[in-house]
Swiss-Prot record:
It holds the Pfam family TraY. It is found in: Cytoplasm. The keyword Cell cycle does not apply. The keyword Transcription regulation applies. This is Relaxosome protein TraY. The gene is traY. It comes from Escherichia coli.
Amino acid sequence: MRRRNARGGISRTVSVYLDEDTNNRLIRAKDRSGRSKTIEVQIRLRDHLKRFPDFYNEEIFREVIEENESTFKEL
C-alpha cells in the first residue's frame, strides 16, 4: 500500500513478527520517547541501516559460499 509520509515521499508498509522480549523493549522505548510504536520502529530501522550499511559483508558472504561449495560463483 502506498501512502504519503511526513517527508513528502511515498512510503511502504512492512509487517514483522516480534518475539515478546523485543516487543516489550520497543514498547518501553516508544513510551520513553513519546512516539508511536510505528515511528519508533521507523527511526530505529533507519538508524541501524545508516550505521551498518554492509551488515552482510560481501567478503564474509563469499567465504561462506565457498565453504559450502555452492553453485553461486558471484553475488
